[in-house]
């Protein structure tokens, strides 16, 4: 039944969140709010890497569940979108005198939610704050900026591709003025890609000669 599928999904995702050190805040329908850094933290960078690693494992697990459900005749298996942001939030017991919940609040939570809704299906979308913390270990593709209520500037986003050291098809480097992101699995014409890189090199060389 639909209820059994959702329960199985939430159970599997919760187990993965706990494995990576995440704190499960709440379930909202078939969505899960997870945060890192409280009550224990490994530091901003490691917390961010753990969170993205958790998200990648969640999508892998969901894919295997989807295969199982299809074999059982489920026509429309579950899909997921994941949004991740790193920032300052308030964590504690909030609520009324009769009922308190240990939860996280703040603009960062709203931004993560906006990233989730802006993500493509079965993809992970990061804010630039998270990307800057994980870019040495996680390959990402630069995506469009999004406007978020309560934030006065467009938020640059990045889509997760995989671990840099485990995926030889991915390459991503950034220096001031130059951002290079390569995914060999998506290149259909190597000659066109080589020509593009050659044109960029010519422009760089010509600027040095001026």
Predicted regions and their residues:
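A secondary-structure boundary/capping signal
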Residues: 28, 85-87, 126-127
